[in-house]
C-alpha cells in the first residue's frame, strides 16, 4: 500500500531488504537482519518496520487501544535498532478491525467506536478506509476495511 503510494508520487520503494542492525552489545555490535520497507519520495528517504494485527471491534474496551499501541510500539522498537543512514525512521502498524456477524445491524456504530479507540493511539499520523460497500461482506466475521498508524522516531 505505501510502496504503491510512493510510486504514484514519482518516488520508489524497496521492500524486505537486508541490513545491519544494532545489538547493543560490545562483543558483537551488529547482526544481519531484514528491514521491511525503504521509501524515497522527493528528497525524503524513509526506512520502516511494519506490523499487522487483527483488532476486535465488536466490543471495544481500553484494551483495544492498548493492544494497538503495543503492536505499533513493537514496530518502533524494531526500526530503532536499524542504523540511520540519512533516512527518517518509521514504525508502522496495519490494523484490520473485525466485527461478529451477529452484530451486522450495528456495523457503522461499532466501527465508529473502534475508530475513536484507534485514533487515541499516540502516533505521528494515521489513515483508514472503510468503504460502505465492504462493511457488510462477511465470512466468519465482518472485516470492513483497514487502518494504518505511523510513528516517526
Annotate the PLM regions.
Residues 18, 49-53, 95-98:
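Short loop/turn segments at strand-loop or loop-helix junctions that form parts
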Residues 35-58:
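Conserved catalytic cores of phosphodiester-cleaving nucleases, focusing on short active-site segments
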Amino acid at each position: 500500500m505505501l510502496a504503491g503510494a510512493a510510486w504514484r508520487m514519482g518516488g520508489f520503494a524497496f521492500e524486505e531488504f537486508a541490513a545491519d542492525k544494532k545489538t547493543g552489545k560490545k562483543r558483537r555490535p551488529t547482526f544481519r537482519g531484514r528491514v521491511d520497507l525503504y521509501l524515497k519520495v522527493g528528497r525524503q528517504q524513509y526506512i520502516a518496520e511494519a506490523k499487522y494485527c487483527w483488532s476486535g471491534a465488536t466490543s471495544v474496551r481500553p484494551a483495544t487501544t492498548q493492544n494497538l499501541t503495543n503492536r505499533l510500539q513493537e514496530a518502533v522498537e524494531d526500526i530503532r535498532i536499524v542504523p540511520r543512514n540519512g533516512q527518517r525512521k518509521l514504525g508502522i502498524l496495519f490494523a484490520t478491525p473485525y466485527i461478529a456477524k451477529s452484530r451486522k445491524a450495528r456495523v457503522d456504530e461499532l466501527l465508529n467506536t473502534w475508530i475513536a479507540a484507534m485514533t487515541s493511539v499516540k502516533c505521528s499520523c494515521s489513515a483508514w478506509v472503510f468503504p460502505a460497500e465492504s462493511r457488510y461482506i462477511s465470512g466468519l466475521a465482518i472485516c470492513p476495511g483497514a487502518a494504518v498508524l505511523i510513528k516517526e522516531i
